Regions:
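Coiled-coil/CHCH-like alpha-helical segments characteristic
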Residues: 1-193
Length: 193
């Protein structure tokens, strides 16, 4: 009986250690995604405020800063690299900068909706001034469910957060706080792709 009890205790300890390690790895993925998104946002801000390219001083060490961060899962890394590379190309080419800035403007609405979807799916509060949009989004999601249609842009919260991170744009202070709350909630919930 004592041997069986020790075995169960040891097994429980190993399972707890493995679970803690898995949570730590998941947290590292979310932290890396957040860091890469912030780095991309820095470049987006430079595109928005840039005079004439090139912005060599501002982008110096980009590869080094990026490479100091651990890699994301391959599909995620590709999407974030695409955002980073598009911003760097816009910083190096004036014609590309105008197109990229226009893309950021067009993506503002999409980013706002994704952030609202994330708050809704994670049960987080939205700012009071966004309650009308949140209600409209809830109605839209209910309508989709009742029509039994595929949910375009739906999917797990992690995938929606990746979509938000991969979309060019600059979050204001309020949206940055909201995004950080989303990252924290996903990390806490242990949601992965």
């Amino acid at each position: 009986r004592a041997v069986e009890s020790r075995f169960r205790s040891a097994k429980a300890a190993v399972e707890a250690a493995l679970a803690a390690r898995a949570r730590s790895r998941e947290a590292a993925v979310w932290n890396t995604l957040a860091a890469k998104e912030r780095l991309c946002e820095e470049f987006d801000a430079l595109v928005r405020t840039a005079g004439d390219p090139p912005q060599d001083a501002a982008t110096a060490g980009t590869d080094e800063r990026w490479s100091t961060l651990p890699p994301l899962p391959p599909a995620w890394e590709q999407r974030m690299l695409a955002r980073r590379d598009a911003a760097l190309h816009a910083l190096a080419d004036h014609a590309a900068a105008a197109g990229y800035a226009s893309r950021m403007e067009r993506g503002m609405e999409s980013r706002a909706e994704i952030l609202l979807e994330l708050e809704l799916s994670l049960g987080l509060e939205s700012p009071a001034e966004l309650h009308a949009q949140r209600l409209a989004l809830q109605v839209k999601q209910l309508r989709r469910r009742f029509q039994d249609a595929a949910t375009p842009g739906g999917g797990p919260a992690g995938e929606r957060l990746l979509a938000w991170c991969a979309e060019p744009g600059i979050a204001d202070a309020r949206d940055r706080r909201r995004c950080e709350r989303v990252f924290a909630a996903i990390e806490k919930a242990g949601r992965t792709t």
